[in-house]
Design a protein with these regions (language model features):
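Cleavable N-terminal signal peptides
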Residues: 10-11, 21
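C-terminal capping alpha-helices of c-type cytochrome domains
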Residues: 24, 95-113
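Gly/Gly-Pro-rich "capping" loops immediately C-terminal to redox-active cysteine motifs
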Residues: 39, 43, 58-85, 91
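The canonical Cys-X-X-Cys-His
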Residues: 42, 47-56, 105, 109
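Positively charged n-region of N-terminal signal peptides that target proteins for export
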Residues: 1-4
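Electrostatic cytochrome c docking/interface patches
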Residues: 22-45
Length: 113
């Protein structure tokens, strides 16, 4: 039993669970990094996001994305779109987004508190 617990702890610490890719392991292409992001366009696109990612954190285990750093949101959305991070719902949502839309959403959500 003790060996089993140690193995589980090791797996958790090393991040081998699906979707546990860290942002520093994702190489964003220059074309997405060079975009500024239109906050107004991001607000227009955000209605689908707000359905699950509620501002008050009441999303039943779904992370609050309001006020997160722009680069973090860009990295996460890019990783879901490219299927680097594993979550079927997020892969489907991000899979429909262009680089411009990803950056616009990130700019919009970064500005919210």
């Amino acid at each position: 039993m003790l060996k089993y617990l140690f193995a589980v702890q090791t797996i958790v610490l090393l991040g081998f669970f699906p979707g546990s890719v860290h942002s520093d392991e994702i190489n964003l292409p220059a074309e997405i990094l060079n975009l500024d992001g239109d906050r107004e366009y991001g607000e227009y696109l955000a209605s689908d996001c707000k359905t699950c990612h509620e501002a008050d954190g009441s999303g039943d285990g779904i992370p609050n994305i309001h006020g997160r750093p722009k680069i973090q949101l860009i990295t996460l959305l890019y990783a879901y779109r490219e299927k680097i991070k594993l979550n079927e719902v997020m892969q489907m949502q991000a899979g429909r987004l262009s680089n411009e839309e990803i950056v616009a959403l990130a700019a919009y959500f970064e500005g919210l508190n």
